[in-house]
Amino acid sequence: IISSALKNAEDILKKSQISSWRLDAEVLLAEALLKDRSEIIIRDDLKISNKKAFTFNRYIDRRKKFEPVAYILNNKEFFSLDFFVNKNSLIPRTETELMVEKAVKIYKNKNPNVLDIGTGSGCIIISVLRHLPKSRGIGLDISNDAIKVAKFNSERLLKVYNKRIKFMNLSIEKLSNNR
């Protein structure tokens, strides 16, 4: 039953000193059950299959070891888009959305070329290009694994606009030496 699974998970996370124990337990259970968080709170008498309980327990085991929820679920919302994230990219920060919002506002009626250094998941450049449809951009990262994450997000989120963006496995030092 949802209520007992949730209570047990909350106790585990609280004991592990996870500050957002309740929210994390609810989010992880909702994902394991493929339901909205509000539904698991309202319909807490629903039964959980063994398979979904196993998935949920794996999520809780990872979270109690302080693995971020975004890495457990391989997902982080940024600027109203759902980005794939993993250990190869930093988790997009809420404060960074303010920077993207400001850039979109400043360049709304212009077509800037965008350079994203340390692109990671590609959240900044992809979000900017989604809102500036005539702009083009390049995302750089020294990690080839991060570039793979950014390309994956670009293909998913930019779709037909993908020809406007290029990702390169390159450090800023090499870029400045190639002048």
Locations of regions flagged by a protein language model:
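N-terminal auxiliary segments of SAM/dcSAM-dependent transferases
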Residues: 1-73
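Hydrophobic alpha-helical packing residues
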Residues: 13, 128, 154-157
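Short, solvent-exposed loop/helix junctions and linker helices
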Residues: 22, 50-53, 90-94, 179
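Short, solvent-exposed polar/charged micro-motifs at secondary-structure junctions
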Residues: 34, 50-51, 80-82, 176-179
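SAM-dependent Rossmann-like transferase core, predominantly class I methyltransferases
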Residues: 44, 54-132, 137-152, 167-169
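S-adenosyl-L-methionine
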Residues: 151-179
